[in-house]
A protein has these predicted regions:
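RNase H-like nuclease fold core
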Residues: 1-52, 56-66, 137-148, 152-155
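RNase H catalytic domain
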Residues: 9-21, 55-134, 138, 143
Length: 155
């Protein structure tokens, strides 16, 4: 892939309580631009925030792009690369015959990834990786901004 056309997407999710108030953050960069996205959801989980971060990031990128997605979530990376085909073949049930959690988001992500050429990269969270650290900051900023806007305390 031509380095000038490379798009890097760094995603992260955070949750204050699990479930609780969640935030997601995305850093997208190529050779010319840098874009940051963030958002929140109430009464959610860290895994939902991890999935939503990737989904929202992909939605902001032109289809047919070549993207390197870096996440610290093995749940997201393994889910989309190893588990999802079995889930679909088993009627959205796990190997233990239980319903797949976050099915709605997995289905949305599965539809989205068909429109891109994606390389998935896992990094250890809070290990100093600049893109991952910034995505983490964005997710936590989103939560802090929600608390500020709604005059609530982060307890």
């Amino acid at each position: 892939m031509d380095i000038r056309n490379k798009i890097e997407l760094f995603s992260d999710g955070a949750c204050k309580g699990n479930p609780g108030l969640g935030g997601w953050g995305v850093l997208i960069k190529n050779s010319k631009n840098l874009n940051e996205l963030k958002g929140t959801q109430q009464q959610t989980t860290n895994n939902r925030m991890e999935l939503i971060a990737v989904i929202e990031g992909l939605k902001s990128i032109q289809e047919n792009s070549h993207i390197e997605i870096t996440t610290d979530s093995m749940y997201v990376k393994n889910g989309i690369n190893q588990w999802i085909d079995n889930w679909k073949n088993n009627g959205w049930k796990t190997a233990a015959k239980k319903p797949v959690k976050n099915k709605d988001l997995w289905q949305e992500l599965d539809d989205l990834v068909q429109n891109y050429s994606i390389k998935w990269v896992w990094v250890k969270g809070h290990s100093g990786h600049p893109g991952n650290e910034r995505a983490d900051q964005l997710a936590n900023e989103a939560i802090a901004e929600f608390y500020d806007k709604n005059n609530t305390l982060n307890i």
